[in-house]
């Protein structure tokens, strides 16, 4: 997709929710998956870059997303919101089920072009964040790391926090790193540039 202008990002809707590949959309539209731990701000990221308030439901209860949620964007692109990981109150068996569902999608979906891996800029990446990044690198899936909640940190400390995140992830310079805030609307254009470069 050469130009951002050809994509009407406001023309977006939730298409379907799927538990396994038999429920995935059956076409060749490119897909960008969004992964991150519970309450990292995935729903806010989706709503902010699409300019919509409640397209993806934000929840005060972590672990709310239990299926792969496919969002149709102008019939040209899809976002796929995968269940948030690292939520302790979900049973081990439930976490294992989610893990299998996520792994099946990430490793077998031909439509997948890249993964937006969301981390919290305020904190060093969790064990699960690092495992997700390593998993994506192992399978040679392009990664866009989006560090959320930048508005919670003084601007002058962003570089320091970015360095902490990158070091913990063993960040590959061929990937993209974006500082993002849905509150201050920071990183929207950079996110679209990185996404459209992959599709």
From Swiss-Prot:
InterPro entries in alphabetical order: G_ENGB_dom, GTP-bd, GTP-bd_ribosome_bio_YsxC, P-loop_NTPase, Small_GTP-bd
Organism encoding this protein: Streptococcus pyogenes serotype M3 (strain ATCC BAA-595 / MGAS315)
PANTHER family according to UniProt: ENGB-TYPE G DOMAIN-CONTAINING PROTEIN, MSS1/TRME-RELATED GTP-BINDING PROTEIN
Identification of the protein by name: Probable GTP-binding protein EngB
Residues that coordinate or bind GTP: 36-43, 63-67, 81-84, 148-151, 180-182
Biological process (GO), any one: division septum assembly
Keywords: Cell cycle, Cell division, GTP-binding, Magnesium, Metal-binding, Nucleotide-binding, Septation
Span of domain EngB-type G: 28-199
Cofactor: Mg(2+)
Magnesium as UniProt keyword: yes
Function: Necessary for normal cell division and for the maintenance of normal septation.
GO cellular component: cytosol
Binding-site list for Mg(2+): 43, 65
Domain of life: Bacteria
